[in-house]
Amino acid sequence: MSQPIYKRILLKLSGEALQGEDGLGIDPAILDRMAVEIKELVEMGVEVGVVLGGGNLFRGAKLAKAGMNRVVGDHMGMLATVMNGLAMRDSLFRADVNAKLMSAFQLNGICDTYNWSEAIKMLREKRVVIFSAGTGNPFFTTDSTACLRGIEIEADVVLKATKVDGVYDCDPAKNPDAKLYKNLTYAEVIDKELQVMDLSAFTLARDHGMPIRVFNMGKPGALRQVVTGTEEGTTIC
């Protein structure tokens, strides 16, 4: 088996990645496959932190457009990430993987409150740590959370799992001739106005020198290939 090139990673999974074909909620089969792929990394000795989005359940920005107060909508979105985190923790437990779910705000009896030193301790013990509830503040995306937590836990890389094979020069769903980039600099992403993640999240990663790799989590084995250094997806650094 190939050796990992990263010791510690922050894996960002969108809420949409958990959806089934009906486009709603959580597909247990997809969740279980992700848990098995994460287990592979743990067995290779990789320390894994996970940030989940909540877009499969709620999106604060969309609720705000419908007339709801944005702060209230974002709070609902944060709770959606906790629900996804509970589902992921359960799948990992059933795959015999030790996992800890942490929330940015107190949810006594459901999960632990985020604590930086405790998270580091758990990672060193090879427990998967799931970070939920975003940053705990409205107006910040879960991409921002992923970059923030990745920097805090001193991850080697933020792995952004998507439904496409990496970063393209245009939308591959609309243009079959879209070009896939293998390597990009932070400056190139900004200059070309490529849609990697929101600007706040991206500039946070850039300012702290946090590499980002974008790949297709829908491809079985892609996560392992990224971690073992194969040319999978797009690398930004």
Curated annotation (Swiss-Prot):
Region (Involved in allosteric activation by GTP): 20-25
Catalytic activity from the UniProt record: UMP + ATP = UDP + ADP
InterPro entries per the UniProt record, alphabetical: AceGlu_kinase-like_sf, Asp/Glu/Uridylate_kinase, Uridylate_kinase, Uridylate_kinase_bac
Protein activity control: Allosterically activated by GTP. Inhibited by UTP.
Binding-site residues for ATP, renumbered to this chain: 12-15, 55, 59, 162, 168, 171
Top enzyme class: transferase
Biological-process GO terms, alphabetical: 'de novo' CTP biosynthetic process; UDP biosynthetic process
Pathway participation: Pyrimidine metabolism; CTP biosynthesis via de novo pathway; UDP from UMP (UMPK route): step 1/1
Molecular function terms from GO: ATP binding; UMP kinase activity
Pfam families found in the cross-reference section: AA_kinase (PF00696)
Transmembrane intervals: none
GO cellular component: cytosol
Cellular localisation: Cytoplasm
Residues that, per the record, bind UMP: 54, 74, 135-142
E.C. no: 2.7.4.22
Role summary: Catalyzes the reversible phosphorylation of UMP to UDP.
Assigned protein family: Belongs to the UMP kinase family.
Subunit structure: Homohexamer.
Name of the protein in question: Uridylate kinase
